[in-house]
Amino acid sequence: MDVLGSIPALADGRLLRRETTTVTYLEPLALSAHPRLRCAFTTRHAGRSGQALNLSFDKGERPAVLAHRQHVLQALGLEQTTLCTVRQVHGNQVCIVDAAMLQRGLTGIAADALVTNLPWVALGVLVADCLPIVLYALDTPVIALVHAGRMGTYHRVAQHALEMIEQRFATPPAHIHAVLGPAIGACCYTLDRRAVGPFQDQFPTWEEFFIPHGPEHWAMDLLTANTLQLRAAGVPTEQIDTASICTACHKHDLYSHRAEGREAGRGMAIVALTSPARVSQ
């Protein structure tokens, strides 16, 4: 249970390395002992096979991607679950994954957050710099997975997910815990005024997560921006766990669109509820 080789004692040990012959992934320490949760942030490594672990159909051949996804689920003990993903559009739409939604299917649904209270249903978002946020409660069987890039952050997607959790599952933000996974850091994410301007107009606290970086340029801190939004929504600071890993700095272990360009593959954040005893389906 060590941290991924080339990533230094990363995030103060908040992520644990897990490896099989086909998958290498990072597990949040905060969730490693949770009896009803499985969670992973995949790396770009297909375990000890030496192959690349791309999980996006847009970036690889469908049979290979399907096999990679199944390997990840197997590594998490979720091989018989449904993996739910949506068409990510950098907005704030939230998809509630209930029995009716599973029956209809999620194909074509545009959203950047998924919420469910169903056991043995895995939620997944693709990432290659954007921030994955896992939301869960200790006293209520409900989980959410959020995809928060620059525009998702602008549209307050994490707050929308929290609102949906409270409305549909009567679980207020004060009862929610959050894990913020690997994402591009301010060290590697410089933006010009055109990109920063909307934040200046809509966020009175914008200077807390934009760092001046030369004339008319700023470095965006996605982790801080979303931490502030979670806190503003009512999630206690002590219930927010942040893994400060920059995907661009560690492009040899994690996918990074900013560092690699349009050809970058995609990793995935995955979270699922289990039940005390596995029931046959």
Predicted regions and their residues:
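Active-site microenvironment for binding and transforming phosphate-containing groups
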Residues: 1-281
